[in-house]
């Protein structure tokens, strides 16, 4: 984590996503997409961190990320996902869901498909039509699931004009994020601190399971599923707390970890190294959580001059039966169970809205209109 | 009224005819609205077709520049860092910190300038290109002024080092020499290049004597005839005493050596050693600080402050800061020679050389089209404790006044408002009220944006604004029929009145549809239920339904009764509650005890006796009354039957 490149881009960044690598590829990530918000004109942009020739003195590649192409986006970009190598799905504050297609030959983006009234308060066709922001989108080729402030869940299929399935009034409050649990199940988080699991095989508008934080009904803003253990889920809340859930048992989180001082906007397990977790927050911080057990020898290497904290799980309410196979995120043994936290950004000011990790690369975007990229996460 | 510092500039709005029609205008925080009215100036009755547009006139146009946004964002971080510099730090460490901050600001300006330059070159439209070029020159002037202020006010260089700093300053800003040098050295025969002597002269003018010597040696190689005098000139250049940063010699020593060297130069001039080469002779005159010879190089000097620094270098290298203003004024006069009048930039630099900080800031405020520069420079100088004595006759001090102006400009921008918040935070007197006024006016199109605004308010304990934002969101949600959301927002705002209103909507929906919506929320109210009586009732009433559903009849019955006896239930809802009691009364086993049944009866009688008597009755009313009367009759019957059963049961239980 020596070099982290910052670039000011004259737009507040709401989402960043790495382009997925082709299966079996040995390359490292080199292209990512960003979406902006709260500008007079918002854009979806593609950036490349590919080498531009200049070898620096240490033999590494010097230079920051370069803009490949961009396209106007109507409304704030609320969420962004790569559908496949070429297609990007964007959720808009206007309630519209758009699929953009990247043409690598002439470096342009175009609109491939659009569901203009995916989310709304008063229906299209009615004279008092009012749209509702689409807050989250998740893709699992060929399916696209979107959620919104209207509490609606849509299931789209690429190349289908209409929604395949819509659950109206799925939630009485705002749905903030969605993720696939295991097909055809999805998991949503809402603004009153609940996780709901929906099974598309079931008819009706009821979730198959509800999990919730007790008491305070703290809104949850983000959710990510463990890449290998599909029952382990991490969520981030308005109070900056990180919660780890085991959806197979109990209706309460397995552990609650005191983290940021303000809203946690995104949480991501590292896709290929899930002992590592990354979070970012409104308080302007970006954290790297390391739950791999060999902490002592690593610590000397890792936190030179950076603020590092050790913590142990504060609340645990799970009786562990099969300790050996369980993920370190669920373990409750206080001796083994230590997490090292490293703060990745040098000085904190405005909100870090988004982050994404792929291989050794991390990208994040802020309200201070900067995009930070590092290519050496585990150096 | 305060005297005007200059004629205000006239901005013409295309399409608006102020000659014929009266104008209407209104001030906003950073903008002004202008439109034509249909009133005529001369009261003629004919209607002149007026302009159909309302114009928004922005004062702080630079805020809207895409490239300058980077300047605003990047400098915001530096600004925050500066505010956090420990007040305890004193002396050297504090000064070096402040100099570092100043350099950071300047490097951001330079980065912006370079990017703007690239864009100006790449611009396809010439008008666009011109606009960018003019921006580049503005940025370059800002950096020039800032750098000088850094040397004079922050670094506070003493005699000796002062001149070295000024030389660096000139070298940094008169940089054509580098491309010229590359051009000359790249040619086949440098000393025969057209600009060879120009280059050598510029190098001497900038005090880059080592480089000048190397150039001279090329001339010596090329023409053996002048090799001798070139070597003499080279030796003079090499021996010129200068203060180097690592040197420990005192100023007096330096002055002595310098005097000695100066006399040596003088001798060569009198001996006419360089008479054969006019170029070398003019170089010698320059090195003697001859004003006439210097002024001959006006073209190469390009501006008066270069002239000033060169003049000082070769006539008074150990100039004291307090003497600067004398040399500055006379250099300006000599350089312009009465041919042209000084421009705003000249006046600003002159004011800086006079150590008149307030004049610098004032002139900059008038000359520059944005508040960024003055706000940040003033703030930095204030941290150097240079501005404390100065108070304005309005508002608070100058630093705060300028920061407020700048931050208000940011708030007028649709997306830079977040930066403005931190600037307001560091305005101790009026920052808070300004923030309060601005933050409420931010349009909230998504909940996410609302959450960000709320976080800003909550961090600063701005309870009034928090309540108002939550209320706006709750209202929006009600309008969109999102009752769950509305209730969440009113709970967050701790707005009891609104929570009551939303709870009523829930209850009304229940009465109409016979089932509750948004159970996920109502079932999880927890302690938030206590916010308002109506909300408590809603929560408890739903609990009753849940108990009933779970067939916990006894618990359900006593909860239902307590809702009425404790007066939590609104009277208008009592009939519904009593109706809900009907199935419980009709259960096979006795649920309401005799005591409870009496209570229920009292409630029913209470309700019916206080019913308003309808004077006039239409058919619909009558029909309603009919249903109502039937209901009451049924209730009375059930209650009586239940009472009978309860008395028997209780009597027999006691008996057994």
Curated annotation (Swiss-Prot), chain B:
GO molecular function, one term: structural constituent of nuclear pore
Pfam families assigned to the protein according to its UniProt record, in alphabetical order: Nucleopor_Nup85 (PF07575)
InterPro entries recorded: Nucleoporin_Nup85 (IPR011502)
Keyword annotations: Acetylation, Centromere, Chromosome, Cytoplasm, Cytoskeleton, Disease variant, Kinetochore, Membrane, mRNA transport, Nuclear pore complex, Nucleus, Phosphoprotein, Protein transport, Translocation, Transport
One GO CC term on file: nuclear membrane
Residues modified as N-acetylmethionine: 1
Organism domain of life: Eukaryota
Subunit structure: Component of the nuclear pore complex (NPC). Component of the NPC Nup107-160 subcomplex, consisting of at least NUP107, NUP98/Nup96, NUP160, NUP133, NUP85, NUP37, NUP43 and SEC13. Interacts with NUP160, NUP133 and SEC13. Interacts with NUP37, NUP107 and NUP43. Interacts with CCR2.
Clinical disorder: Nephrotic syndrome 17: A form of nephrotic syndrome, a renal disease clinically characterized by severe proteinuria, resulting in complications such as hypoalbuminemia, hyperlipidemia and edema. Kidney biopsies show non-specific histologic changes such as focal segmental glomerulosclerosis and diffuse mesangial proliferation. Some affected individuals have an inherited steroid-resistant form that progresses to end-stage renal failure. NPHS17 is an autosomal recessive, steroid-resistant progressive form with onset in the first decade of life.
Stated family: Belongs to the nucleoporin Nup85 family.
Its biological purpose: Essential component of the nuclear pore complex (NPC) that seems to be required for NPC assembly and maintenance. As part of the NPC Nup107-160 subcomplex plays a role in RNA export and in tethering NUP96/Nup98 and NUP153 to the nucleus. The Nup107-160 complex seems to be required for spindle assembly during mitosis. NUP85 is required for membrane clustering of CCL2-activated CCR2. Seems to be involved in CCR2-mediated chemotaxis of monocytes and may link activated CCR2 to the phosphatidyl-inositol 3-kinase-Rac-lammellipodium protrusion cascade. Involved in nephrogenesis.
Official protein name in the record: Nuclear pore complex protein Nup85
Organism: Homo sapiens
Lineage per the UniProt record: Eukaryota, Metazoa, Chordata, Craniata, Vertebrata
Gene: NUP85
